[in-house]
Amino acid sequence: MNILFWGTPAYAVPTLDALHGAGHTIVGVVTQPDRRRGRGKQLVPSPVKARAEELGLPVFTPERIRRDDDCKAKLAALGADASVVVAFGQILPKDVLEQPPLGSWNGHGSLLPRWRGAGPIQWALLEGDQETGVGIMAMEEGLDTGPVLLEQRTPIELLDTSIALAERLSALTAELMVQAMPLIEAAGTGPEDERLAKLNVRVQAEGSTYARMLEKQDFQLDWSASALSIHRKVMGLHPGAFTQLHDKRLKVLRTEPLIERLQDQLSTEGRSLVGQWPTGGHPPGTILAMIEDLGLVVSSSGCPLLIREAQLEGKARSTAPALLQQLKATLGDRFGEV
């Protein structure tokens, strides 16, 4: 098949590689324009653009595809059979979606209709979902509302970070998209409703949830919340969740709630950490213990939380005992106090 690929972040690269490796002709790659990054504010290409150039593929970088008629004309001239979209970063207009005769297909990182929108992986972790997955969806004008052709599920582990989960879902998306292509090709051209009927797609049920864009305040830890809620924020927003200790900002990178289901791995010198520090009587965010080879035990609602890895403002990320030395904290100090 002749495929026009749309994608931007590293998450999309495995799908591009998989389609290319499966023998499909990638007639073009559409990605977001280069952005200025880092201290030097140098222009940096997207991971998809960098990979496409390594593969010798033509690349297009429209600032706003909806308004770029010149780019639309160039893409139409490529003669793609289908468009494949994975985390492109712009909403595609109807005329672009309907251009390829075999349709436009999206690899989405959730079990639709749960977590439509731009941050499904983060929100699945934040809300404590037990499983998630990926779906190959026929695209339409609505945001992630199209019928689903293929879907694959995966469990969410308590200690998964958003980065680890994204890597799993990215690989699943690549596998599933390769499986989808011969099915889409076999359905042939013609009216969309007839093609989709041949493919026996699943129309999304009611009861959708929306993965809204995250804002700065979402990343700040609230120590009055439950240990599980704080842990989910740390893992779901990795590596961006933060707190304060006195006048310093601390990025919290890895935590473990001191709960029974983690009892076997939460031990030191053969003694379980679970149940050692009742939180009653301690204000939220209070440092209850500093364990040299593990980290800090901090009070929260319900049970304490173990901070295993963090990054103090102006320092490199670190684990115990270096973290304890950098913080210069004492028992009874409180996170969240400025």
From Swiss-Prot:
What keyword terms does UniProt attach to this protein? Protein biosynthesis, Transferase
> Which Enzyme Commission number(s) are on file for it?
2.1.2.9
Q: Which amino acids does the record list as binding (6S)-5,6,7,8-tetrahydrofolate?
A: S110, L111, L112, P113
A Pfam family this protein belongs to?
Answer: Formyl_trans_N
User: What InterPro entries does its record include?
Assistant: Fmt, Formyl_trans_C, Formyl_transf_N, Formyl_transf_N_sf, Formyl_transferase-like_C_sf, Met-tRNA-FMT_C, Met-tRNA-FMT_N
Q: Which GO terms describe its cellular component?
A: cytosol
What is the top EC class of this enzyme, as a single word? transferase
Residues annotated as transmembrane: none
Task: Return the CDD domains for the record.
Answer: FMT_core_Met-tRNA-FMT_N, Met_tRNA_FMT_C
Q: Name one GO molecular function term.
A: methionyl-tRNA formyltransferase activity
Recorded catalytic reaction(s): these are: L-methionyl-tRNA(fMet) + (6R)-10-formyltetrahydrofolate = N-formyl-L-methionyl-tRNA(fMet) + (6S)-5,6,7,8-tetrahydrofolate + H(+)
Question: Entry's HAMAP family?
Answer: Formyl_trans
The record's function comment reads: Attaches a formyl group to the free amino group of methionyl-tRNA(fMet). The formyl group appears to play a dual role in the initiator identity of N-formylmethionyl-tRNA by promoting its recognition by IF2 and preventing the misappropriation of this tRNA by the elongation apparatus.
Database matches in NCBIfam families: fmt
Q: Which family does it belong to?
A: Belongs to the Fmt family.
Q: What is this protein called?
A: Methionyl-tRNA formyltransferase
Natural source organism: Synechococcus sp. (strain CC9605)
